Amino acid sequence: MKFHLISLGCAKNLVDSEVVLGCLRDAGWEMTDEQDADLLLVNTCGFIQPAVEEAVEEILALVDIKADFPEKKIVVLGCLVQRYKEQLLESLPEVDLFVGTEGVANIAEYVGKLIAGEEQDKVIMPTEFLMTAKVPRQQSTPFFRAWVKITEGCDNRCSYCMIPSIRGPLRSRSVADVLEEVQAMVASGVQEISLIAQDLTAYGDDLGDDVNLLVLLKELLAKTSVPWIRLLYLYPSELLDELLQLMAANPRIVKYLDIPIQHVNDRVLHLMNRPYGRADLEEFVDKARAHMPDIALRTTFLVGFPGETEEEYAEIGEFLRVRKLDHVGVFPYSNEEGAPSEHFPDQVDDEIKESRCARLLELQQELSTEIQKKYVGTVQKVLVEGVSEETDLLLEGRTQYQAADVDGRVYINEGQVVAGEIVDILITDSQQYDLVGGVVSVE
């Protein structure tokens, strides 16, 4: 039997999709294109309305295929099911099976029954799955880099966010289990692991006082040889002081942090139910650069939050002009059904939200152009990704200061190297987000 899988949403969702791939592979299924497949699956995102709309469009595209080939089966998985199961069941009768976020590890059993015509519920909603190293998983990223999801769920209660109600409470994997998975990845040739969670700094909060992110990192440093360890999605917290010290002392933890701060105005942050203020953010950025002057910092901002004034919005631009963060994403606020902020007064007009978003992105583009110039004339370690997406005449890769999929890249215009190598590159030019350089040496 053959299947086709579409994966939507974030890296954490992609790990779930890789579990689906691994489970179906082990059950004897073969992956193919949507026309040749007996089974059509889509792992959905339901975090924000644009993601919901994208997921529905993908499902309807599969429904169109099934209209021409009614023998095909459609399975919808993930966050959209978790959030809107009743509405989906009513509005999409063409879908044969709906599976919530916690059902990915049992997908082979569910689709086996579906294909065999055995009786089972049309909507399957298991509770509180936790990834382990023993769960089958087929890596879909290039062989030299992988995502490692160290928690499920979230205990933070941001007023605009539905993740806790979709993904459930925080559940942390054991240190030994994460270590086992990373050791297997290194043995298969992985050069870079990116630790991911809704909030990495919350790792271990449910496991007792002796387990936290620092403990995990020290074990990974001591018991694996992975060259690059990247940390994505952290909260400003008390843990960060010690984390910065550990990063500064261990070059295998790349000098890069992704901390989605969302805003800098104290009143807006309070309304968002974020547990820090502008002074905390400024202190963290200054501390990070005191420990590691070359650290790259990424963040995201949410503009147009209910009640946000033009003056409060302008504080973000002031913050960026002074602190000059390396990588910035900006998103317009959208009301999410069931989130507390849905009912907040003084909702901001969509046109104003889009304008604020565009202006902030334009500012960051100007700042980024200047920030990138500091790399020109330096030699940087670059993880080679392969032939450039822009032209077959160039190779491309990333420095430790660039995360996959979201940041810029290094275009390699001189020298012969292969994907998966970490090489020394002399940076000769910079662009708005990208760098250009040639090979100096290969590790």
Swiss-Prot record:
Ranges where the TRAM domain occurs: 373-441
Pfam short name (any one): Radical_SAM
Cofactor note: Binds 2 [4Fe-4S] clusters. One cluster is coordinated with 3 cysteines and an exchangeable S-adenosyl-L-methionine.
Binding site for [4Fe-4S] cluster 2: 154, 158, 161
Residues of the Radical SAM core domain: 140-370
Cofactor: [4Fe-4S] cluster
Function: Catalyzes the methylthiolation of an aspartic acid residue of ribosomal protein uS12.
Protein family membership: Belongs to the methylthiotransferase family. RimO subfamily.
Signal peptide interval: none
Presence of the UniProt keyword Phosphoprotein in the record: no
Residues reported in the UniProt entry to bind [4Fe-4S] cluster 1: 10, 45, 79
CDD domains: Radical_SAM
UniProt keywords, alphabetically: 4Fe-4S, Cytoplasm, Iron, Iron-sulfur, Metal-binding, S-adenosyl-L-methionine, Transferase
UniProt-listed Enzyme Commission number(s): 2.8.4.4
Protein's cellular compartments: Cytoplasm
GO molecular function term, any single one: 4 iron, 4 sulfur cluster binding
Catalytic reaction list: L-aspartate(89)-[ribosomal protein uS12]-hydrogen + (sulfur carrier)-SH + AH2 + 2 S-adenosyl-L-methionine = 3-methylsulfanyl-L-aspartate(89)-[ribosomal protein uS12]-hydrogen + (sulfur carrier)-H + 5'-deoxyadenosine + L-methionine + A + S-adenosyl-L-homocysteine + 2 H(+)
One cellular-component annotation, GO: cytosol
Gene Ontology BP, a term: tRNA modification
Broad enzyme group: transferase
Gene of this entry: rimO
SUPFAM superfamilies linked: Radical SAM enzymes
Protein name: Ribosomal protein uS12 methylthiotransferase RimO
Record organism: Desulfotalea psychrophila (strain LSv54 / DSM 12343)
